[in-house]
A protein has these predicted regions:
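Accessory terminal helices/loops
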Residues: 173-249
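Active-site neighborhood of phospho(di)ester-bond hydrolases with catalytic His/Asp-centered motifs
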Residues: 16-19, 38-48, 59-63, 130-133, ...
Length: 249
């Protein structure tokens, strides 16, 4: 579950969009990159996006995700029983560690983000979009000037997921219908490489035709074990945006 972690540099403070699984200290890594205050934003509350959120003093997200973030994540979120191994952990160095022991530290939000909010970094600004369906409080960050959307798991270049315990397929269909009609040139998803508008339309249309859905989460999880490392990790889009690979930290 290699979540994309985006570090966006600003004039007075930096943004961190999602925080990965929390297998090692993300904050330690970030402090080597910047001395500015960090506003950590979680696009939604799933374990692979909020694992290191607790390390940061400023934790922002949608109020509909708050209840989950306040608790140690349970097996509904981490798919206990489906995931036995964490590939990034060296079994020889840490023989006692297993996926079944994995937990996420509670990280209560210190502030809320919702539709219409704007985060101004000085050099650029992001409009918050509420994109429910994958989860109740999924959000995206849209730069209207550059026409880039950081979409979390509302849209990524892979099989889409709408059947978790708190997913809502009907809302998800509305979200995807909305996204496909937005004026966006580049999509930075919660997983996999970034992509353009034509690919976004293809992904969404395939979803609506039933060809691009994860129908059984645990089966998909087991099938995904042992997949090769993401060759697209550590992407740099410009001087102010860096994609941090989970394999680095």
């Amino acid at each position: 579950m290699r979540c994309n972690i985006w570090h966006i540099k600003g004039q007075e403070f930096d943004l961190l969009i999602d925080t990965g699984m929390g297998l090692s200290s993300l904050k330690k890594y970030i402090l080597e990159e910047t001395s500015k205050p960090i506003k950590a934003i979680v696009t939604h509350s799933h374990f692979d996006h909020c694992g290191s959120l607790h390390e940061f003093n400023c934790r922002l997200g949608h109020k509909n995700e708050e209840e989950i973030l306040e608790k140690t994540l349970n097996d509904k979120i981490v798919f206990s029983g489906a995931w036995k191994e964490i590939e990034i952990i060296d079994k020889k160095q840490f023989p006692e560690y297993s996926g079944e022991k994995y937990t996420v530290t509670p990280a209560p939000l210190t502030g809320y983000l919702d539709e219409g909010d704007v985060i101004d970094l000085g050099s650029r600004a992001f409009n918050i979009l509420h994109l429910p369906g994958h989860s109740p409080g999924s959000i995206g960050l849209l730069d209207l000037k550059s026409k880039e959307l950081f979409s979390g798991d509302a849209l990524y270049d892979g099989e889409l997921l709408d059947n978790l315990y708190h997913s809502d397929p009907k809302l998800y269909e509305k979200t995807l219908s909305r996204i496909i009609n937005l004026d966006i040139n580049i999509f930075h998803g919660g997983h996999f490489p970034s992509f353009g508008k034509n690919r976004a339309k293809e992904i969404i249309n395939n979803y609506f035709s039933g060809q691009n859905k994860i129908k059984d989460v645990k089966l998909w999880f087991n099938k995904s074990k042992g997949m090769s490392k993401d060759i697209f990790s550590d992407q740099n889009w410009d001087s102010s945006i860096k994609l941090i690979s989970q394999n680095e930290i």
